[in-house]
Amino acid sequence: MEDVDLGFLSQEKLDEKDYLDIECSRVGGAPLFIRKNDAAFLNESLENSFEFLMQLYAPKNSEISYHRILYIFINRDGDSQTAGWTRGVKVFREQARETDEIDFQLITSKVTKLIDSSEIEVDAEPKEENKKEIPEKLKNVKVDTENPSAEPYTKAKGDVSFLKFQKRLSRAPDQIMRYYHATSNEFPGLWCNNECIPSSIPNCACGAKRQLEFQILPTLISSMNIDHSAKNALDWGILSIYVCSASCDLANCGLAEELCWLQTFSEQGIIAPE
């Protein structure tokens, strides 16, 4: 059975003291790095158009990943958010052993205005019988009632996937991310469109396979400080984060870059039943 934890935004805002808590998974604020060298490298190499979106404290049960943080940076220009292995989202992994000397560094120059700082609270996904109201953002997807019989096979695929997506989110409409505890890609995650799912996942530079670790949902967009009506506003269906399955030690001597797959909603909309 698929084991999924959900992430929700806390109602309490964070301050700099909270930013210095390595175990605090959060959106917004300033990113905290385990090593000063990693912070300096990122500060110099990351393009100015990228803003800090979130960091997730996700240690693994191994010596080299006693401390393990995943960082997400996103390009504020929505036009850069292309479907597939997008270059508009940057993912980094940083790790340390319990015995390592920790040299924390907060990059205050990367404090983001994109989203207010908030801790990510985690809870297990409710059972299906606990489903609630569908989020307004997902209710407003275009419904095609003009020609329900046209291209039934092609459209049904996307529609079925989106309806499953709606149904799953209805269990906890305020969720902004989904974290998977699977040790392989046997459980493929949640998708809003059958037409844009990765069929081939690049391996890590260490040679190990990458696997889906968590997904960032479109429900987060409504909390972002952006002009939602702008032509190039940030938008996505699902951001799927693929990470080295071995949590290799490349992240113990620097930042290991991982991958993000961006899935968009189907442009065909939902077809009403006959």
UniProtKB/Swiss-Prot annotation:
InterPro entries: PDCD2_C
Lineage top rank: taxon: Eukaryota
Pfam families xrefs: PDCD2_C (PF04194)
GO cellular component: cytosol; nucleus
Disulfide bond entries: none
Biological processes per GO annotation: maturation of SSU-rRNA
Family, similarity comment: To mammalian protein PDCD2.
Name of the protein: Uncharacterized protein C13G6.09
